[in-house]
Every structure is written in C-alpha cells, then in structure tokens.
Amino acid sequence: MPKPKKTRREASHTSIMFDGILSSMAILNARDEEEVRKQFQQLNDPVKLVVFSQSLAAADLCAENEQLVREVAGLSDKISVEVLNLAIDRERAEAYGVDQVPALVVDGARDYGIRFYGVPTGYEFSNLIDAIIVASTGEPALTDETKASLAALAGPVDIKVFSTPT
C-alpha cells in the first residue's frame, strides 16, 4: 500500500491522500450530530440536497462536500441526496443555475434559490442547517421587522455571501 500523505487538517476532519484517492474520516463529531438531530426535529416536508461535483475539477473539495452532505442527510429521514456531475448533467445544472463545483442546491417543496458553492463547513455549517430547515418548513427565522423590510423591496434581489476558510 502506498505511503499516505496528509493533505490538510481542519478542526474535526482529516483527509489522507493515497496516490490521488481521497480517504476521509467523519466530518461531523458525535456532539455535532446530536445538535443537528435536535434542529432537524423542526423539519416538516422532504428536502433534497443536490450535489454537483466533478472528478477532475476540485476533486478533493467535491469529495469533502459530498461526504458532508451525506453525513447531514443521514441525520433525518426527511432529507435525500442526489449527486450530479456538472459536465455530464449540464441540463440539470443549468436548470438550477449552477456553473461551478463543488455546489450544493437545497431544494424543498419549492426551489428557494439556496445554493452553496464550496464546502459549507466552519461558520457556514449553521447556515446550511438553517437553509435545510427553511426549505422544509417554508418559514425563514426572520423577525417581523425584517419581513416588513423585505416586503418593501421593489423587485427580486440576488444576495451572495462570500466567506473564507476558517
């Protein structure tokens, strides 16, 4: 067996590379899983997490993203996962407006336009959990004041949040 080379270390995740094959331990620890299960008790309707990957483009990040999504989905029977290849499944990618990888679409009873590009770990992980809850319940956790401000907008708004690795 080839000698492993450590590729990177994060707070709760270690990736080991064996001649180009990514082998990973669990991303979520037991405490995280317990907390997410509690949060997922709020889920009403099914949610589909659509992962767009590509083996040649950002392969390590795509594998990590898919693993994280599968771990999260495993915490509720109301969450399913569909993995698509950006190059092969172009029509589906275009329908979702996805043009880069790794990408994650959070799709509930309707498509709220929630997309994550990159791996939603660190501070973005709580946003992923919130997005799943919103897609399932149809109710974002917003104050009445925020809802009134949003209702006053004259037209659609495209909000993009950028973050750096933590």
Spans of model-derived segments:
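Polybasic, lysine-rich low-complexity intrinsically disordered segments
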Residues: 3-7
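Short, positively charged and aromatic/hydrophobic N-terminal segments
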Residues: 9, 13-23
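Local sequence-structure signature of Cys/Sec-based thiol-disulfide redox active-site neighborhoods
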Residues: 39-75, 152-166
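Structural micro-motif
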Residues: 46, 90-114
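Catalytic cores of nucleotide-enabled group-transfer and carboxylate-activating enzymes in metabolic
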Residues: 46, 83-85, 101-104, 135, ...
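Thiol-based oxidoreductase modules, predominantly thioredoxin-like and allied folds used
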Residues: 77-89
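Non-catalytic, surface beta->alpha helical segment in thiol-disulfide oxidoreductase systems
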Residues: 105-139
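Long, charged amphipathic helices and adjacent flexible linkers at domain junctions
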Residues: 135-153
